[in-house]
A protein has these predicted regions:
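Cell-envelope/extracellular polymer assembly enzymes that use nucleotide-activated donors
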Residues: 3-6, 35, 184
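Glycine-rich, basic loop-to-helix element that forms the pyrophosphate-binding segment
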Residues: 65-81
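A conserved acidic beta->alpha catalytic loop
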Residues: 40-49, 90
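Short, well-formed alpha-helical segments that are part of the catalytic scaffolds
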Residues: 14-27
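Conserved nucleotide-sugar donor-binding catalytic segment
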Residues: 136-218, 223
Length: 257
């Protein structure tokens, strides 16, 4: 079977949302051949049973057993990738309907594209704030460039896809980074090739109080600033980044977002 997409999904006691994540993938267009690579950190719940129950003709599944951290888990997963196009999802993310066929068609129609970004919809119980973030990111994403990305990461990880050959060119995820390995990767990618932004909702990001992005908020933003400074030495950009980050942290804290 010729694999179109390899999707890495790190898991750890992920039974609550994993079925929905998997369903959103296997319900894609049946002409798409998918490799699902689960990198499990030692789940004690029903996570592995859920994974083993996948039985789709167009879906190849693999499980990597590890307790080595998220970034290492991603790299180990992508070493197993057989598809032309790569991405990764958290175990509570979801793809939108027709996401993969839209991405595949874009890559095939625009041969020079190295990576593609679509829109992502934040979902959860904070309806107003989710809609505000969705509006903010969607409109800024249309103007994405290196400096804008340096000011703030407006790219939503579940809606990013790249060619396997491009991944080899830019290198694997930095295993010294705990929270923002995706932000570092996007900055490295955009310095090599500008992404194509497509006007489609590609994924859903589930925001809840147990998600990594909800917890460790201050540590996450401190790390993000350090990453940005490695890639962009411009003091004006750095200052704007800091001010915007402080404002975002303030809003997130007072609203418990």
């Amino acid at each position: 079977m010729n694999i179109d997409f390899s999707i890495v999904i790190p898991t750890l006691n992920s039974e609550k949302y994993l079925k929905e994540t998997i369903r959103s993938i296997i319900s894609q267009d049946k002409s798409i051949n998918i490799q699902l690579i689960f990198s499990d950190g030692g789940s004690k719940d029903q996570t592995l049973e859920i994974i083993k129950s996948i039985n789709e003709k167009n879906c190849l599944k693999e499980i990597i057993y590890n307790q080595i951290g998220l970034t290492k888990a991603l790299n180990e997963g992508f070493k197993k990738a057989k598809g032309k196009y790569l991405t990764y999802l958290n175990s509570d993310d979801m793809l939108s309907k027709n996401a993969l066929i839209n991405i595949k068609n874009n890559f095939e129609q625009k041969k020079n594209n190295e990576w593609i970004i679509g829109f992502c919809e934040n979902v959860g119980d904070k309806y107003f704030l989710n809609n505000l973030v969705n509006f903010y990111k969607k409109n800024l994403l249309k103007f994405i460039n290196f400096n804008l990305l340096s000011i703030n990461n407006v790219i939503s990880q579940p809606s990013v896809f790249w060619k396997k050959s491009f991944f080899h060119k830019v290198g694997e995820f930095d295993e010294n980074i705990k929270f923002n390995m995706d932000y570092d990767m996007w900055l490295r990618m955009i310095k090599v090739s500008k992404p194509d932004v497509i006007d489609n909702n590609i994924s859903f990001f589930r925001r809840h109080n147990k998600s990594l992005s909800h917890n460790n908020l201050i540590s996450q933003f401190k790390e993000k600033y350090k990453i940005m400074r490695i890639h962009n030495k411009n003091l004006v950009i750095s200052t704007i980044h800091l001010l915007l980050s402080a404002f975002i942290v303030f809003i997130y804290k007072i609203t418990n977002y």
